[in-house]
C-alpha cells in the first residue's frame, strides 16, 4: 500500500510549446542558451543547452548538454500504472488542484497502490 506521485510534461507542451522554443540569458558571471526542437518519436523533444560559466580567473568555460524528453497520452500512463499494480490515480495540472485542460503544460499523477 502506498502513494506514488509524479509529474510529466503534457502532450500539448511537447507538441506545441517546446518545438522552436528558445531562451537566452546573459549575466555577468554566466550566459545560457536553450533551444528546443521536436524529435522523431511522437510527443518527444530535444533540448540543446549551452552554458558559459566564469572561472575564478575571469575566463569563461563552455558546457554543452543535450536533453531528450518524451511523454505519452494519459491513457498510456493509465495502462502502465494498472500493469504496475496501481488501483487508481488522480490527475491534476499546472501546479493546481484542477483537472488538466487542453492547454495544460504539466500533468501531476497521484497514484494509489
Predicted regions mapped to residue ranges:
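Glycine-centered, small-residue-biased loops immediately flanking beta-strands
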Residues: 2
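SAM-dependent methyltransferase
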Residues: 5, 9-76
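C-terminal lobe and adjacent flexible extensions of AdoMet/dcAdoMet transferase-like proteins
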Residues: 68-113
Amino acid at each position: 500500500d502506498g502513494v506514488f506521485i509524479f509529474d510529466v510534461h503534457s502532450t500539448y507542451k511537447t507538441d506545441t510549446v517546446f518545438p522552436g522554443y528558445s531562451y537566452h540569458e546573459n549575466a555577468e558571471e554566466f550566459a545560457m542558451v536553450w533551444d528546443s526542437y521536436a524529435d522523431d518519436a511522437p510527443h518527444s523533444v530535444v533540448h540543446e543547452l549551452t552554458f558559459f560559466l566564469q572561472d575564478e580567473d575571469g575566463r569563461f568555460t563552455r558546457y554543452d548538454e543535450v536533453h531528450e524528453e518524451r511523454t505519452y497520452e494519459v491513457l498510456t500512463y493509465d495502462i502502465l500504472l494498472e500493469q504496475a499494480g496501481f488501483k487508481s490515480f488522480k490527475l491534476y495540472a499546472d501546479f493546481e488542484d484542477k483537472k488538466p485542460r487542453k492547454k495544460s503544460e504539466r500533468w501531476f499523477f497521484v497514484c494509489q497502490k
